[in-house]
Amino acid sequence: MKIKNIIDKKNEDLIIALSYVLEKPKSYIFLNANKDLSKENTKKILDIENKLNENYPLQYALGKWDFYNINLIVDERALIPRFETEIIVDYLIKSNFNKECILDIGAGSGAISLSLAYNLKSSKVLGVDIEEAALSLARDNKKKLIIDNVNFIKSDLFENVDQKFDIIISNPPYINRNDYESLDKKLYYEPKSALYGGYDGLYFYRAIIKDASLYLNEKGHLIFEIGYDQKEEVNKLLIKSDFKNIINLKDFNGFDRFIIAEKG
């Protein structure tokens, strides 16, 4: 099979998959359309195509995915890291906030924890998750990337956390009951526990905000990723709990997606 045969299918996910299989940029694929694929790579790409035809997520089909400037193992043990989340990682890394100690609640694959630890060598990062499967994936990624300034523990939110932090960051489950029942088919391959945020999608925001100040140092910051229509409600919860200097950030599509708030 030639590379051109894949290009002719006009399937963007398949092009991305081929770039991962070949470990080459997408430009290489189009500049080398007449090259033959090896038997091994032909089998790999056809296997991936079959999975994509069943609405299986591309990232799971590949088993790996780039996030910020690290490459993660990705599988059904945890939520697929979204490129939008890189916005808040980048913001935090470049901020002048105190960030000696960082807590990531709902660490999942470890994408946020590991990218922060990798880029903030002097910081200590703790990732917590209630799901053993997700923790095993996060630890696999830590081992793969050889990052020493991050640890992962099992904890239901703050249950097993016994210290204070400069930063608490979380991308919690925030899909509400009605929206969950009408999701894209691909999303049902991801763990429900990483997507479903209760009847109104705000369960975890309420729970985290209620206790966050107890685990934040003075001038510490609480950072959330939110659903596109949740800004006002989460802002109200933060204000009610005496958080101040609230900042709202948008994603690449112009939707309200992140909230940063300082401990009051």
Task: Say what each PLM segment does.
Residues M1-D13:
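Non-catalytic nucleic-acid substrate-recognition regions in nucleic-acid-modifying enzymes
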Residues Y20-I93:
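Conserved AdoMet
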Residues L62, K154-S155, I226, K250:
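Short loop/edge segments at beta-strand edges and connector loops
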Residues I87-E181, K186, A207:
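Conserved SAM/SAH cofactor-binding pocket of Class I
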Residues E132, K185-Y215, H221, G227-D229:
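Glycine-rich S-adenosyl-L-methionine
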Residues K142, A212, L238:
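Conserved hydrophobic residues forming the short capping helix/wall of the S-adenosyl-L-methionine
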Residues Y228-S241:
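Short alpha-helix
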Residues I239-G264:
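Core SAM-dependent methyltransferase catalytic element
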